[in-house]
Design a protein with these regions (language model features):
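Short, flexible, mixed-charge glycine/proline-rich loop motifs
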Residues: 16-27, 47-53
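Short, non-ligating residues that shape and space the ligands of small metal-coordination modules
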Residues: 39-40, 68-69
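N-terminal single-stranded DNA-binding subdomain of primase/primase-helicase replication proteins
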Residues: 33-37, 44
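Cysteine-rich micro-motifs
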Residues: 51-66
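Short cysteine-rich clusters marking metal-coordination/redox-active sites
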Residues: 30-33, 59
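Short linear interaction motifs
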Residues: 11, 40-42
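Short, intrinsically disordered terminal segments enriched in charged and Pro/Gly residues
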Residues: 1-24, 70-121
Length: 121
């Protein structure tokens, strides 16, 4: 399985500057390799007993990634077709990052992802 490396801080900044994932969930340009292969997956969770969201952004071409956890913004609704498709695998999602991203890539290539995101304020 291919190991992933992290986007550099300047690449993460470029990802945030060049894209608004909440408006468009399609793949976009990777600041590292130049391929249109950057994908994002959001997962609802709880952190300190409060609603939270885990965000993973990765490039399917050069295998760079970034992840973060933060509070779930009020009014943000995230569909999670993976959870509906395979609840057992979804529960074990973070046991191995290489397996996680391989699984997310398969779901993307099979048309299960990207997710839909609705933000009502």
């Amino acid at each position: 399985m291919i190991q992933l490396t992290r986007f550099t801080p300047s690449e993460v900044e470029a990802l945030g500057r060049d894209r608004n994932f909440l408006r468009d969930q399609s793949e976009w340009l990777c600041p590292s390799c130049g391929e249109v292969s950057v994908r994002t997956y959001l997962r609802n969770t709880k952190h300190a007993n409060r609603p939270a969201v885990i965000s993973y952004t990765w490039c399917a071409a050069c295998r760079k990634m970034s992840g973060s956890t933060g509070p779930l913004p009020p009014g943000l609704t995230i569909s999670d077709p993976w959870r509906e498709l395979d609840p057992a695998a979804w529960e074990q999602f973070d046991t191995s990052l290489p397996r996680l991203f391989a699984r997310l890539d398969r779901l993307w290539e099979d048309g299960v992802l990207p997710q839909s995101v609705v933000w009502t304020r």
